[in-house]
């Protein structure tokens, strides 16, 4: 699997995930800087108030 891993509005970058990892995630929340977006491999557990989208195809988490 290949997932995007660039933060927020940075230029797009992606990375290959470890063998057996088939998910990518896009996690969003707001703080004093505005909306923060984190992307990567896997499908993490998040705290309430954080928007999480997980998907199962290459570069699906933009």
UniProtKB/Swiss-Prot annotation:
CDD domains: TFP_snake_toxin. This is Short neurotoxin A. Belongs to the three-finger toxin family. Short-chain subfamily. Type I alpha-neurotoxin sub-subfamily. Binds to muscle nicotinic acetylcholine receptor (nAChR) and inhibit acetylcholine from binding to the receptor, thereby impairing neuromuscular transmission. Residues 1-21 are annotated as: Disordered. It is found in: Secreted. Expressed by the venom gland. It holds the Pfam family Toxin_cobra-type. GO terms for cellular component: extracellular region.
